[in-house]
């Protein structure tokens, strides 16, 4: 969700100039003064009540909520309902007057101050984006350049209405007789607005147009894809914005997946989408009727800890899920499948990387019946390679002989006992690349290792046009290069690991989905929203979802719409993952609790 609404952000930021920023900053300064005054007054109310309680032998904690005792009130965590004084304070003769004054003051100023805080608290993020956008435009003007990703925006500015179709569109429409657009569920509203007039011109000239897509496979909203365009077209809703008259046809035959998996997906997703107000067409299985294997493994930390007597009780759900996933791989290997027949699909790249390292450790330890030989274009970080670590720690020790961590790793982990000879290395008279090549030669680093080769390639790019200073490179390694991935090409009899996004359109005999317990609504990251306030110069603002529930109806509707779209996004991801297998589907996740959070009958995770 960190990348949601990029088009909105880009559009608004691109229209804000330096003079506009001055107005915005002036509004922000005034608004935040009001917020601070509101917080100050609430804290004064709290301290006054506590003083009255102390003077009259009353226990202040009986009348003030613990979260704000001692005047700890902040608008950041404040809710629409006043939770400062407890109702008991209103019934105490000494406190009732103060209780009424506080509630009246809170009710009068809370909503206004909460709005101001949400709009202006992160104003410097907006200023930074505006500065970057203006600097980008200056650089493009200097180079007489144009970014290809801005093409849609440029066309959008030209195509202002149906009555003003540009000359080139008329010419193209008269020549193209048939138009087909595939994967239409990932089309952005901006792109569709540009194409729509071309399609209308084509149809008016006697041609034909067809769009293909599946709203259930729309998983690129973070890249401005909007499944609602396809849904409106399929429903024949020509009155909706950006729509035209259509005839919808469902292609329901499934020739990929065994019947039992198709039937399961029909039952699961028809109910799940129905709860979101979306009716979907069920698929008709055309392959291996009565066949197909579905497996679910649930992990429970509490149960597992109690059953493993004598072991440490610091088990994590992630550890158990990795063990359970490995057991699923073993199950299929024991039943005649090869590693080449399988794929592991992950919602998050971080989980993919963690599991890839786990499998590598299993292979290196040699304690299991099978070798897993994991491969992925997304999993393996440079910093995870022992050979690369050796190079980097040697560089660190050369740069600073007092680096005890580097010294310990080289001596105890890598088993290098002759660190004194590193004193002979003269970094002032040799380039960084030559220094690394000498390290590879002198310390028996495997020069053919794929990680070492990737490290050398990235080092060469770094050194091109930059300082060869060792300290600068170590900073670059810590900040950036250590997090870069290495593509491990698929070899014969290797296990492929992918994110769900990368697996779209592909098929596999066996699909295993570890960590299948992600949140359907993400409250961890801020989302950029358009400002609903007419008098504000701020066009957009970032906010978490929860605070928006605590303002008024306009903000409530805004956040409910975002939560709804996130549920659809994550359900679509689940659908894409569950429809990749041909014969077998395995799901691994933590055991859901009885009181799992849900909203409108739909689970949060």
Regions found by a protein language model. Give the residues of each.
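Short glycine/proline-rich turn/loop motifs
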Residues: 109-116, 132-138, 142, 247, ...
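Metal-dependent DNA phosphodiester-chemistry modules and their immediately adjacent helices/loops
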Residues: 385-423, 543
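Active-site-adjacent bridging/hinge elements
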Residues: 107, 126-130, 203-209, 488, ...
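Conserved ATP-driven helicase/translocase motor core recognized via long
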Residues: 1-145, 592-605
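C-terminal accessory regions
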Residues: 418-433, 443, 491-495, 547-604
């Amino acid at each position: 969700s960190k990348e949601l609404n990029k088009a909105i952000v880009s559009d608004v930021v691109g229209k804000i100039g330096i003079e506009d920023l001055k107005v915005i900053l002036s509004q922000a300064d005034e608004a935040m003064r009001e917020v601070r005054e509101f917080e100050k007054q609430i804290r004064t109310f709290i301290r006054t009540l506590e003083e009255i309680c102390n003077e009259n032998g009353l226990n202040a904690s009986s009348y003030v909520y613990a979260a704000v005792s001692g005047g700890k009130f902040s608008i950041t965590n404040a809710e629409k309902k006043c939770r400062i004084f407890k109702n008991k304070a209103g019934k105490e003769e000494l406190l009732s007057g103060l209780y009424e004054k506080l509630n009246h003051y809170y009710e009068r100023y809370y909503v206004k101050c909460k709005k101001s805080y949400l709009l202006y608290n992160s104003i410097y993020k907006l200023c930074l984006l505006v500065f970057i956008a203006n600097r980008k435009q200056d650089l493009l003007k200097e180079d007489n350049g144009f970014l290809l990703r801005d093409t849609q925006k440029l066309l959008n500015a030209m195509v202002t209405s149906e009555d003003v179709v540009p000359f080139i569109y008329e010419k193209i429409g008269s020549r193209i007789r048939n138009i087909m657009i595939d994967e239409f569920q990932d089309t952005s509203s901006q792109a569709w607005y540009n194409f729509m007039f071309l399609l209308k011109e084509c149809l008016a000239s006697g041609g034909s147009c067809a769009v293909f897509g599946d709203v259930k496979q729309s998983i690129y909203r973070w890249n401005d894809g909007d499944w609602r365009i396809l849904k409106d077209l399929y429903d024949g809703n020509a009155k909706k914005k950006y729509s035209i008259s259509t005839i919808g046809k469902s292609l329901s035959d499934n020739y990929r997946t065994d019947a039992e998996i198709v039937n399961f997906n029909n039952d699961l997703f028809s109910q799940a989408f129905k709860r979101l107000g979306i009716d979907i067409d069920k698929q008709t299985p055309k392959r291996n009727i009565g066949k197909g294997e579905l497996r679910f493994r649930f992990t429970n930390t509490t149960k597992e800890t109690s059953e493993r007597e004598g072991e440490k009780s610091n088990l994590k759900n992630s550890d158990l899920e990795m063990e359970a996933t490995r057991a699923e791989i073993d199950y299929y290997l024991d039943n005649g499948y090869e590693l080449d027949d399988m794929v592991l699909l992950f919602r998050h790249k971080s989980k993919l990387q963690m599991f890839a390292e786990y499998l590598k450790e299993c292979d290196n330890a040699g304690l299991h019946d099978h070798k897993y030989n994991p491969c992925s274009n997304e999993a393996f970080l440079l910093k995870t390679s022992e050979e690369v670590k050796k190079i980097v720690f040697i560089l660190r020790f050369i740069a600073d002989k007092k680096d005890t961590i580097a010294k310990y790793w080289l001596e105890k982990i890598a088993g290098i006992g002759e660190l004194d000879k590193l004193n002979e290395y003269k970094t002032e008279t040799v380039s960084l690349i030559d220094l690394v090549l000498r390290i590879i030669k002198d310390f028996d680093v495997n020069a053919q290792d794929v990680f070492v080769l990737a490290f050398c390639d990235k080092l060469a790019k770094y050194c091109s046009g930059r300082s060869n200073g060792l300290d600068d490179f170590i900073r670059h390694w810590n900040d950036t290069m250590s997090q870069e991935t290495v593509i491990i090409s698929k070899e014969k009899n290797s296990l492929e690991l992918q994110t769900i996004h990368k697996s779209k359109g592909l098929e596999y005999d066996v699909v295993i989905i570890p960590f299948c317990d992600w949140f359907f609504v993400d409250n961890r990251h801020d989302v950029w929203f358009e400002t609903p306030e007419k008098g504000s110069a701020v066009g957009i603002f970032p906010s978490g979802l929860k605070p928006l529930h605590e303002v008024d109806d306009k903000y409530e509707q805004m956040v409910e719409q975002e939560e709804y779209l996130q549920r659809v996004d994550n359900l679509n991801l689940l659908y894409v993952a569950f429809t990749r297998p041909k014969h077998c589907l395995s799901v691994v996740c933590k055991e859901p609790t009885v009181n799992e959070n849900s909203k409108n009958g739909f689970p949060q995770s």
